[in-house]
């Protein structure tokens, strides 16, 4: 349990560093792009799964 507390403490320190520095604006843009890509891939796989499910029936 202490191990997880230390891991999350380190993550929070790193997140705080990025939040209070100028890096956060650049990383927010990258995060938005990656989220958009992940959303598109999810929708593609969702459509493919629905089409495969209908092909079985």
UniProtKB/Swiss-Prot annotation:
Pfam families: DUF1328. It is a multi-pass membrane protein. It is found in: Cell membrane. The keyword Transmembrane applies. The chain crosses the membrane at residues 4-24, 33-53. The keyword Transmembrane applies. GO terms for cellular component: plasma membrane. Keywords: Cell membrane, Membrane, Transmembrane, Transmembrane helix. Belongs to the UPF0391 family. This is UPF0391 membrane protein RL4195. It comes from Rhizobium johnstonii (strain DSM 114642 / LMG 32736 / 3841) (Rhizobium leguminosarum bv. viciae).
């Amino acid at each position: 349990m202490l191990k997880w507390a230390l891991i999350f403490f380190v993550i929070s320190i790193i997140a705080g560093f990025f939040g209070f520095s100028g890096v956060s604006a650049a990383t927010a843009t990258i995060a938005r792009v990656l989220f958009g890509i992940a959303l598109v891939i999810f929708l593609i796989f969702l459509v493919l799964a629905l089409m495969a499910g209908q092909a079985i029936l």
